[in-house]
Structure formats: structure tokens, C-alpha cells
């Protein structure tokens, strides 16, 4: 029997609630507009993550980039000006190929890079062979840019299923979703983006933001977001660091 594992970190008291929610939603893909499930695994099952330790004060600002020429550099400038040297950028490799200088700066500034595949296709609609082909192409592109040993994957379009998780496991990727959605790509207004993040954020959260050209208000919202995170006593770390010291417990969803 195939098994799909759902983890939640250090919240044993919420285990029953998590199991009920997971059973109710297990047949659905994970999309940007949906409330994400806590999806984790042991070494014996598919692996994904949406949140770190809830008892921690660490959080992770993550930025997706799949297209555009105008937003990434200003966002990097804003992060640097506000003392953030450890964000996590999930890059489409086709975009990275066209912007080698920006990729080099992301690394130089101290940020972590994760993959969003190559062609920004919906992996949930692809056969395993097609997913592997795209992952291989992305891996080759990143290696040519000097970015090696990428360990994090955020599936293109934000959608994934059991098959995607299984293929990602074969490549030793940890699939990363998010627990706080800024909705910045919808350009709802600077104050709304700030509220979407700061009104619900807590320890362990992975925050979804964008540095593609579609996200026109993110740069302006960032200083207030960072300031309010600090006021709450929260500290930004890379996703890699966020999950590195996690003490997780598992529950099986069949």
C-alpha cells in the first residue's frame, strides 16, 4: 500500500485536528489560493514542508521568481537596506539563465536558492518522466551558473501531488510550500500585502512573496513587513536553517 505522510512540528496537542483536516483535503492539489496543509514525511515517504517549529521565533521570507526584468534587483536592494541577508529565493531555471548577474548577486548577498524547475510547468499535470526531464534541465542550468547542491524545490505554479513528491524525493529535494500567503502577486495594495503577512505570522512560518514583475507592490511593502516582524520578536532565517533543527512527529495518511 502506498502511504502519504503528514507532519506537524512540535504541536502534538493539535494532532487530531491536523489528521481530520488532512483526511478531508488529501485528494486536493496545493495551490496558491488554497489554505495549505502541513505536509511532511519520514524517510519512508514523500517529503514536503510548509512550516518550521511553532515554538521557535524563526520565520522564512521566500520569494518566487519566474519571469521579468524589473523587480528582482530592487527587492534585493530593499532586503539589504533592511538587514535581511538570508531570504530564500525560488527561481525558475529558465529565468535564471537569462539573469546570471542577478543570480550571482542573490548568492553574494547571502540568500539561499531553491529550484522551481525549468519551464514553469504544472508538475501535478505531468507524468513522472516529464517532471524528471524538467528537473534535469533545471539542474543543468543552475550548475552552469555555479549554483550547485540545491536541496529545496517549490513546484512551479505551487501545485503538487503524491507523484510530484515521490519524484522530488528521488532527487533528494525537500518540497517547500508556505504557511503565510502575502497574495502580493495580485497587487491588492501595499497595506493589504503588509496585513496579509503580519496579521497572521507566527514562529515557524514560511512566507510566500514574489520578485517577478507581476508583483508590483512587494518592494514598497517589504520595509514595513520586516519592521513588524522584528517588533514581534521574529527572526528571518533561510528555509534550510528553518527546517534543519526541526523536531518533527509524524502521522500517517493512507
Swiss-Prot record:
Gene3D superfamilies: Glycoside hydrolase/deacetylase. Residues 1-24 form the signal peptide. Residues 57-237 form the NodB homology domain. It is an enzyme of class 3 (hydrolase). One of its GO terms (biological process) is carbohydrate metabolic process. Its EC number is 3.-.-.-. Its main location: other. GO terms for cellular component: intracellular immature spore. GO terms for molecular function: hydrolase activity, acting on carbon-nitrogen (but not peptide) bonds. Negatively regulated by SpoIIID. It is found in: Forespore. Keywords: Hydrolase, Signal, Sporulation. InterPro entries: Glyco_hydro/deAcase_b/a-brl (IPR011330), NODB_dom (IPR002509), PdaB-like (IPR014132), Polysacc_deacetylase_ArnD (IPR050248). The keyword Repeat does not apply. Belongs to the polysaccharide deacetylase family. Necessary to maintain spores after the late stage of sporulation. Might be involved in cortex formation. This is Probable polysaccharide deacetylase PdaB.
Amino acid at each position: 500500500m502506498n502511504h502519504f505522510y503528514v507532519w506537524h512540528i512540535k504541536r502534538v496537542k493539535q494532532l487530531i485536528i491536523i489528521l481530520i483536516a488532512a483526511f478531508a483535503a488529501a485528494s486536493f492539489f496545493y495551490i496558491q489560493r488554497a489554505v495549505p496543509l502541513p505536509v511532511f514525511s519520514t524517510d519512508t515517504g514523500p517529503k514536503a514542508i510548509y512550516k518550521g517549529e511553532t515554538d521557535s521565533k524563526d520565520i522564512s521570507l521566500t520569494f518566487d521568481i519566474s519571469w521579468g526584468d524589473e523587480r528582482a534587483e530592487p527587492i534585493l536592494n530593499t532586503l539589504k537596506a533592511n538587514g535581511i541577508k538570508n531570504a530564500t529565493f525560488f527561481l525558475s531555471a529558465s529565468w535564471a539563465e537569462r539573469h546570471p548577474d542577478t543570480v550571482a548577486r542573490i548568492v553574494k548577498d547571502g540568500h539561499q536558492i531553491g529550484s522551481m524547475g525549468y519551464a514553469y510547468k504544472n508538475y501535478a499535470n505531468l507524468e513522472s518522466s516529464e517532471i524528471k526531464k524538467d528537473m534535469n534541465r533545471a539542474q543543468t542550468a543552475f550548475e552552469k551558473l555555479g549554483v550547485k547542491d540545491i536541496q529545496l524545490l517549490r513546484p512551479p505554479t505551487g501545485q503538487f501531488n503524491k507523484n510530484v513528491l515521490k519524484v522530488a524525493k528521488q532527487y533528494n529535494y525537500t518540497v517547500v510550500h508556505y504557511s503565510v500567503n502575502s497574495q502580493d502577486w495580485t497587487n491588492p495594495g501595499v497595506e493589504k500585502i503588509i496585513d496579509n503577512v503580519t496579521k497572521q505570522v507566527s514562529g515557524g512560518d514560511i512566507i510566500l512573496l514574489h520578485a517577478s514583475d507581476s508583483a508590483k507592490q512587494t518592494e514598497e511593502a517589504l520595509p514595513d513587513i520586516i519592521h513588524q516582524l522584528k517588533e514581534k520578536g521574529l527572526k528571518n532565517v533561510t528555509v534550510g536553517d528553518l527546517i534543519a533543527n526541526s523536531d518533527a512527529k509524524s502521522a500517517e495518511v493512507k
